[in-house]
């Protein structure tokens, strides 16, 4: 059955604030797979208190949620983030009414072919979605280690995540500001540098990016001349710095 959401769309376009349910585990919008339609959906509210009450209802499910305010000027980037996360459906709560709205009805889906002229992964929704589902389940508090059904579910989520990782490309940043003449990717030479992050303990972390959006959040030396390379997951190892550590929050 087709639902006419035109009135709701007009309200969306005029709203100054929406409230969104986020996962405390991933710090991203909380995503659920609808058991009947298999839509990957998020929850939005017009009222902050309603969003908070919804979050409280998930406490008994051992699913810690929080309510995040999204301002009108933030909405385009927020909706792009939902596409990056693999979301296709919004459950919109307005007062005592609840509507299911396809994300494409709220914000147009980006033209991936047009955006991907450089063959860089503009979005990696398959990876992000399966990682989100895996982490949301893996880090649930108050779980029994001898729960065989849950462990089987975790193995299935992990397997799906790994399949998507193996199929994906990741963005590697290369600093060529010290290279003399033309840069040759096949013969990079000693003047090519790999950007890294060092914390207060002198630990080194090498940034890899799942998509362009994640790269844009990274702010290296503004004087650095960076070249982006799309590397298949199975070919990443030769590019990784030996002294780099794994992110302890993963």
Q: What do these predicted regions represent?
A:
Residues 1-250:
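An interfacial alpha-helical scaffold signature
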